[in-house]
Amino acid sequence: MNAVLSVQGASAPVKKKSFFSKFTRLNMLRLARAVIPAAVLMMFFPQLAMAAGSSGQDLMASGNTTVKATFGKDSSVVKWVVLAEVLVGAVMYMMTKNVKFLAGFAIISVFIAVGMAVVGL
């Protein structure tokens, strides 16, 4: 038994929708219609929006000393992370000869320092 396969019509590539096609004027108006009432309610009732009460209890307060000891400025974890960044940056530079990888550890170290300061460690 012989089966013959045939294609009906001309095969044309299917045009994919662009990522930016989602950002149409109509979609932006729909988004604004959904967001503006919520923003107005949060503006008039900030206590409900933030769910902050004066009688709240910090359940994670007992772990602050442990976190500061593990991830603080003088901890060994931060030193090992920086050392790993330097080694990975050096190896990636040797493999690709791209200076971005070599200087990347300095940029990541700055981000870590700023992040630690923001968090309070």
Swiss-Prot record:
Subcellular location, principal: membrane
Effect of residue 100 to A/R/T: No effect on propilin synthesis. No effect on pilus formation. Inability to support R17 phage eclipse. Reduced DNA transfer
Outcome of mutating residue 9 to S: No production of pili
Mutant phenotype after disruption: Loss of sensitivity to toxin CdiA-CT.
Effect ascribed to mutating residue 105 to V: No effect on propilin synthesis. No effect on pilus formation. Inability to support R17 phage eclipse. Reduced DNA transfer
Topological domain ranges for the Periplasmic compartment: 1-75
Impact when changing residue 120 to C: Resistant to phage R17, conjugation normal, provides partial resistance to CdiA-CT toxin
Transmembrane parts of this sequence: 76-96, 101-121
InterPro entries linked to this entry: TraA
UniProt entry keywords in alphabetical sequence: Acetylation, Cell inner membrane, Cell membrane, Conjugation, Membrane, Plasmid, Secreted, Transmembrane, Transmembrane helix
Pfam family membership, one: TraA
Effect of residue 73 to A/T: No effect on propilin synthesis. No effect on pilus formation
Secretion signal span: none
Membrane topology value: Multi-pass membrane protein
Residues that make up the propeptide removed upon maturation: 1-51
Impact noted for substituting residue 79 to I: No effect on propilin synthesis. Defective pilus tip assembly
Cytoplasmic topological domain: 97-100
Family: Belongs to the TraA family.
Name of the featured protein: Pilin
Native source species: Escherichia coli (strain K12)
